[in-house]
Amino acid sequence: MPAGRAARTCALLALCLLGAGAQDFGPTRFICTSVPVDADMCAASVAAGGAEELRSSVLQLRETVLQQKETILSQKETIRELTAKLGRCESQSTLDPGAGEARAGGGRKQPGSGKNTMGDLSRTPAAETLSQLGQTLQSLKTRLENLEQYSRLNSSSQTNSLKDLLQSKIDELERQVLSRVNTLEEGKGGPRNDTEERVKIETALTSLHQRISELEKGQKDNRPGDKFQLTFPLRTNYMYAKVKKSLPEMYAFTVCMWLKSSATPGVGTPFSYAVPGQANELVLIEWGNNPMEILINDKVAKLPFVINDGKWHHICVTWTTRDGVWEAYQDGTQGGSGENLAPYHPIKPQGVLVLGQEQDTLGGGFDATQAFVGELAHFNIWDRKLTPGEVYNLATCSTKALSGNVIAWAESHIEIYGGATKWTFEACRQIN
């Protein structure tokens, strides 16, 4: 470029810069830039000044595009999963000849397929109602048997007369249910009759529940604080008991209890202890066709217990963090032992202790297929390993039997939920 033209270019650029800003920023300095002959000098200067801003905007746009792309990919993956699940459902409906009935009344849920709220479901609404009524009647009969036993011990003529009245009511209800079963089998009865009979039976059951609850309340007022049992009559995800106290940090423990169950397959979960970050900190469970197991920090040991014969059994498990050594006792006799069960892992404090349910989350996440069905009493925990003699004293109801120094069986320490019940129980006097 000739020297004269370059000088004119610098002069024009200086005029553009001076015209673009009215403020005085101190001594003026001139910057010469080579540009094409036909270019607009002022426009070129402004473009050079905004280059950084444009570059920043481009980077922000690129980041936004990448984020949107990730969101779209995630949504596509979700759509693919939902489509696959829908396809499986449709294929099962096509292959299953009873799909229509299953949709109308529910179907049997396979273990491990997800949360189950009520265990086994019946084929039709009517059959389901009758099944639930039968279970309720059985629960009421069991409660009356306990009241009868209590009245014998206390020689209460008023309790006996009321018990006889309630027993006759239950017998009448059983006849109504049996009659309804026969009607269903013969294919008789319409929706209106179904509704009327169900309302009548449910009304009678409600009245019975109230009367029995009054009896049990009077029974509770007169019994010692540790002479009681918990009953879980149904396999649900809402029936449980919670111990008000938590556990301290423990480097050894012994847990003992009385259990009675005839549930199959598996009696369920007598107790579970969960802490933040670990739902299986300490669990006793018998699920499906597996043997009973003890879990510590999600580590498992199989126990030699056989208790689902409908009889009362006393069980104890001892453990120490040193080498993870454990021992299992049934009815006062050691039946198994092992080591390397969560060695050198202390039981963590400040958790939630639940009776009758397995926790998938802290204090919840219950699954009906893992619920305990049966009766439980004298649940005690010590922060040490009991000796075989001490365990034997517990199983034989010796006067030397100890109460738990961490968790002691007391009615004031237990809260019940969802229909679980408490009534009088005296170990060794009422067993089998």
UniProtKB/Swiss-Prot annotation:
Ca(2+) 2 binds at E358, D360, Q370. Residues 226-428 form the Pentraxin (PTX) domain. Its main location: secreted. SUPFAM superfamilies: Concanavalin A-like lectins/glucanases. CDD domains: PTX. One of its GO terms (molecular function) is metal ion binding. Binds 2 calcium ions per subunit. It holds the Pfam family Pentaxin. Glycans are attached at N154, N193. It is found in: Secreted; Cytoplasmic vesicle, Secretory vesicle; Endoplasmic reticulum. GO terms for cellular component: endoplasmic reticulum; glutamatergic synapse; synaptic cleft; transport vesicle. One of its GO terms (biological process) is mitochondrial fragmentation involved in apoptotic process. Ca(2+) 1 binds at N280, E358, Q359, D360. InterPro entries: ConA-like_dom_sf, Neuronal_Pentraxin_Related, Pentaxin_CS, Pentraxin-related. Residues 90-122 are annotated as: Disordered. PANTHER family: NEURONAL PENTRAXIN-1, PENTRAXIN. May be involved in mediating uptake of synaptic material during synapse remodeling or in mediating the synaptic clustering of AMPA glutamate receptors at a subset of excitatory synapses. Homooligomer or heterooligomer (probably pentamer) with neuronal pentraxin receptor (NPTXR). It is linked to Spinocerebellar ataxia 50: A form of spinocerebellar ataxia, a clinically and genetically heterogeneous group of cerebellar disorders. Patients show progressive incoordination of gait and often poor coordination of hands, speech and eye movements, due to degeneration of the cerebellum with variable involvement of the brainstem and spinal cord. SCA50 is an autosomal dominant form characterized by cerebellar ataxia, oculomotor apraxia and other eye movement abnormalities, and cerebellar atrophy on brain imaging. This is Neuronal pentraxin-1. It comes from Homo sapiens (Human).
